[in-house]
């Protein structure tokens, strides 16, 4: 029986060989993006600069380059960043639904809700149950205790965060890959005001909860803002097979949108500024700002899961 990592690698390779099958390549070319392969890690990516040689991963570039230099058109509070996304997507026909519980009582393979797509696995994704809407958005509180060692190190990790979902459930003929991709691309450029030249889009694959598919990761200045997964497959003992529905699973860290719009040293200063100030006051902690600002742009490279 093949493991999930092996299956993900197979899908990633198929997508690399035939990107038109999985990705919105017509939209990318319409926007003036070209496909390249990272000279450092070998990953395929799309960028406005046709001569670009490296992908957007912080390990392949200069870490976080948005610190003290936010690329967005305005600074957003944590509440405002959700409201901006919600208004933008509702105007485009998505239904905004309420969050699900963080205890995943409808599943027998996990205890906690770890991402927005968990809310719909396995029964909605498999077609056994009706979705609350065919095209929806959701601000889903998510728990990830496997990230404990990264909290406070990378500047972006939490054990309790909000995964904003753009989720769609459609029959094959009704599934509109180009539109779903365009909606998120234009939210980034028009909604957040990030210049197209800042966007680096990675081809990859994702799997979890018994499903998997190719995906497109959106990077800006060394930070992955969100990941749009084209969840077309169900994992089986023999490998994987196509789902009856075509499922879109975009997951965006709410905290990262707030962070990149503020350009603070870590996301915590943007998401919970009052809490941090209170903690400094209570502990008497004084931060060496010069050392802090030199170190934190490179904290992106300290993901415990990815370093030796």
Residue ranges and their predicted role:
Residues 1-29:
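Short, intrinsically disordered terminal segments enriched in charged and Pro/Gly residues
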Residues 38-41, 55:
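Short cysteine-rich clusters marking metal-coordination/redox-active sites
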Residues 36-39, 216-218:
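Short acidic-hydrophobic surface loop/beta-edge motif
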Residues 17-20, 24, 34, 67-68, ...:
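Generic signal for short, ordered secondary-structure residues
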Residues 66-308:
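Structured aminoacyl-transfer and RNA-binding surfaces used for tRNA recognition/handling
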Residues 25-34, 44-49:
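Short, flexible, mixed-charge glycine/proline-rich loop motifs
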Residues 49-63:
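Cysteine-rich micro-motifs
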């Amino acid at each position: 029986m093949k493991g999930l990592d092996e299956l993900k690698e197979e899908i990633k390779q198929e997508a690399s060989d035939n990107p038109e099958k999985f990705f919105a390549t017509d939209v990318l070319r319409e926007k003036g993006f070209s496909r390249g392969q990272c000279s450092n890690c070998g990953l395929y990516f799309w960028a406005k600069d046709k001569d670009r040689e490296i992908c957007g991963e912080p390990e392949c570039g200069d870490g976080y380059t948005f610190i003290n230099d936010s690329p967005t058109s305005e600074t957003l509070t944590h509440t405002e960043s959700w409201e901006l996304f919600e208004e933008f997507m509702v105007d485009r026909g998505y239904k905004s639904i309420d969050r699900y519980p963080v205890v995943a009582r409808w599943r027998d393979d996990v205890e906690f809700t770890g991402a927005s797509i968990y809310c719909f696995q396995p029964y909605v994704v498999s077609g056994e149950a009706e979705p609350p809407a065919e095209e929806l958005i959701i601000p889903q509180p998510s728990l990830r205790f496997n990230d404990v060692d990264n909290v406070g190190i990378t500047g972006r990790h939490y054990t309790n965060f909000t995964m904003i979902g753009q989720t769609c459930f459609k029959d094959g003929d009704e599934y509109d890959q180009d539109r779903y991709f365009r909606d998120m691309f234009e939210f980034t450029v028009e909604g957040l005001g990030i210049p197209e030249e800042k966007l680096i889009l990675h081809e990859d694959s994702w799997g979890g909860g018994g499903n998997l598919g190719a995906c497109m990761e959106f990077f800006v200045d060394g930070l992955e803002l969100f990941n749009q997964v084209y969840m077309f497959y169900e994992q089986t003992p023999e490998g994987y097979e196509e789902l009856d529905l075509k499922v879109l699973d975009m997951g965006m860290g709410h905290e990262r949108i707030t962070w990149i719009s503020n350009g603070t040293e870590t996301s915590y200063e943007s998401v919970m500024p009052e809490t941090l100030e209170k903690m400094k006051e209570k502990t008497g902690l004084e931060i060496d700002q010069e050392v802090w600002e030199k170190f934190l742009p490179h904290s992106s490279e300290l993901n415990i899961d990815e370093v030796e």
